[in-house]
Amino acid sequence: MAELRALVAVKRVIDFAVKIRVKPDRTGVVMDGVKHSMNPFCEIAVEEAVRLKEKKLVKEVIAVSCGPAQCQETIRTALAMGADRGIHVEVPAAEAHHLGPLQVARVLAKLAQKEKVDLVLLGKQAIDDDCNQTGQMTAGFLDWPQGTFASQVTLEGDKVKVEREIDGGLETLRLKLPAVVTADLRLNEPRYATLPNIMKAKKKKIEVIKAGDLGVDLTSKLSVVSVEDPPQRVAGVKVETTEDLVAKLREIGRI
C-alpha cells in the first residue's frame, strides 16, 4: 500500500464561458452575481492526483483552496472527483481579490510542511490572471524540485518522472520526492463528478483555517493601477489587387 500523500491546490475563478465585465471604476472585474467554477488547470491537477490514488500509488489526496467562503464549493467539487478531504484557508472577500501567487505559494508551502505531503500538484496557471507563478514559488519556498507544464506524470518509487512539452519537442525530468508538479492541458481529461459522488462529497471533511494559523501574512506587495477592456478591433478593408493594397498602405502612412 502506498504511503505517499498529495496536496492539490484548487482555485475558484469566473467560469470560462462568462463574458468578463470591467468595473466602472476600473479597479477590477465584476465578480458579484457571476458564475464561478474550478480553474480548468486545477481540475486537471485533481484528476491526476485521483488517478495516482486509484493506482494505489498515493494514499491520500488533500484539496486546498484560499479565498472567501464560496471556495468551499470548489473544494467540494474536488472531493466529488475523488479527493479525500479538503482544507479551506479562509480569506474575506474584500481581501481575496488582492491574493497573488506569492501569498498563495506561502500558504501552500506551509500546508505542505504541516501535512507532511510528498507531492504538491496544481494547475500550471489560472485562467483569470494567467500568472503561471504559484507552482514555481511554492517549490522555491519549500526548496523542492519542480516539474512544470507536465503532460505526463509517473511515480517511480521515491521519484516522479515528469514529461513536459517544450518548443523543440518533449523534455523528460526525473525529480526526487518530495516535489512540486504543475499540470498542463494535455496531462489528462478530467472526469465529471457523478451524482452519487457529489452526495458523498457532502460528508467529507473540510477543515477551515486562517492564513494567520500558518504564520502567513497575506499583505500584497502589488497594487492594481487599472483594469481596462481590450481596445475594440477596427474593421478591416478589402482590396482587390496588389496595387490597391500598396495604395491603401501609403494612404494610411504604413509605407
Curated annotation (Swiss-Prot):
One of its GO terms (biological process) is fatty acid beta-oxidation using acyl-CoA dehydrogenase. Residues 183-205 are annotated as: Recognition loop. PROSITE patterns: ETF_BETA (PS01065). One of its GO terms (molecular function) is nucleotide binding. AMP binds at residues 9, 39-42, 66, 123-134. The modification N-acetylalanine is found at A2. The keyword Transmembrane helix does not apply. The modification Phosphoserine is found at S223, S226. It is found in: Mitochondrion matrix. Methylated. Trimethylation at Lys-200 and Lys-203 may negatively regulate the activity in electron transfer from acyl-CoA dehydrogenases. The modification N6-acetyllysine is found at K200, K210, K238, K248. PANTHER family: ELECTRON TRANSFER FLAVOPROTEIN BETA-SUBUNIT (PTHR21294), ELECTRON TRANSFER FLAVOPROTEIN SUBUNIT BETA (PTHR21294:SF8). Heterodimeric electron transfer flavoprotein that accepts electrons from several mitochondrial dehydrogenases, including acyl-CoA dehydrogenases, glutaryl-CoA and sarcosine dehydrogenase. It transfers the electrons to the main mitochondrial respiratory chain via ETF-ubiquinone oxidoreductase. Required for normal mitochondrial fatty acid oxidation and normal amino acid metabolism. ETFB binds an AMP molecule that probably has a purely structural role. The recognition loop recognizes a hydrophobic patch at the surface of interacting dehydrogenases and acts as a static anchor at the interface. Belongs to the ETF beta-subunit/FixA family. This is Electron transfer flavoprotein subunit beta. It comes from Sus scrofa. The lineage of its organism: Eukaryota, Metazoa, Chordata, Craniata, Vertebrata. The gene is ETFB.
